[in-house]
């Protein structure tokens, strides 16, 4: 059964437009509360958020909806998505809720959920919530209404958890790091994590005003980080997105490294320490160069659909530990139950410190193939698969590339966009074919 409200990462949209309105979000929380009470008499949920101005409004709506269903609420304030996942598990809560639209600009917002174990919830749970949404509310009686409170030092608890994943035998002393938190949920957390492990930290993107989240900073706009690393002669740059679940890094020369390269580094580091790495899960977007480098190390790469939930599902199915996306969602399931930009950065830095080599030296033998991505806006109800102009162009390009490249055309799971990607050894050729396909998509 198709989901009506839930996308690949919760429910997301423009604030003030369905479904991201206070009345719907209240109803959503009430429906979730009713689902929780089917198996638990007095559930408790944690609610965290990023720094969007709309977070205040949506937080209040969620609190009211849960309380009206007889569910207690613990407010965490601004906290990275993986921090909410961690505290949900650590506090033995029934559910974790995050108010965030991740890397999107401030006019958007969203709601996503974590299980009591700090993991993404299955489709069946989301369908149960949608069914409850279609039913009439069943308000709890006055004696059964839920309560709300704030958790003291939620940020400090999460900081200590992040630090616990970094080897106690190692330090970041003598290392200068520029940290860009995208004016998002990690603004008051990320600089402290690296500082408390010994690094000299220069913070940018750490002054949220409710409107500037992800604006020209962070993992989706790394130019600011590159400039800051070069200007301050830093050793590393770390860029997170608005909810701090994705990571991009920069070396001392100002070169940017994406999730594909960092995923390979994490696998190679484990191999160098004699750990068993039977395989790694990437996505349809994972660069061919990484696949070949892993293969040379005797490690299989399996491609899942784009979206960290699909990477997680494949990891669980195979009982593997490492996976990730080009965008910087990296998963190390023996470190955390979900993607965590801060913990991923610590694992990369730990590998470099332990090996006594810079990021550039560590990854010098991995050179990504040129990959050109063009986004085409989709109109409401537009079926790109029925576009015969695009389908004919797709067949033609695939025939021309043969075994020397890849083409991927897919609809975004979070935005009304068609993503056209072409990967081949020649950048000009990749760009030509990608724009040719994008033009065909628009023409149809």
UniProtKB/Swiss-Prot annotation:
It holds the Pfam family PGM_PMM_II. It comes from the Bacteria. One of its GO terms (biological process) is carbohydrate metabolic process. This is Phosphoglucosamine mutase. Binds 1 Mg(2+) ion per subunit. Activated by phosphorylation. Mg(2+) binds at residues 102, 241, 243, 245. Its EC number is 5.4.2.10. GO terms for cellular component: cytosol. The active site is at 102 (phosphoserine intermediate). Catalyzes the conversion of glucosamine-6-phosphate to glucosamine-1-phosphate. It is an enzyme of class 5 (isomerase). It catalyses: alpha-D-glucosamine 1-phosphate = D-glucosamine 6-phosphate. PANTHER family: PHOSPHOGLUCOMUTASE (ALPHA-D-GLUCOSE-1,6-BISPHOSPHATE-DEPENDENT), PHOSPHOHEXOSE MUTASE. One of its GO terms (molecular function) is magnesium ion binding. Belongs to the phosphohexose mutase family. The lineage of its organism: Bacteria, Pseudomonadati, Pseudomonadota, Betaproteobacteria, Burkholderiales. Its cofactor is Mg(2+). The modification Phosphoserine is found at residue 102. Keywords: Isomerase, Magnesium, Metal-binding, Phosphoprotein.
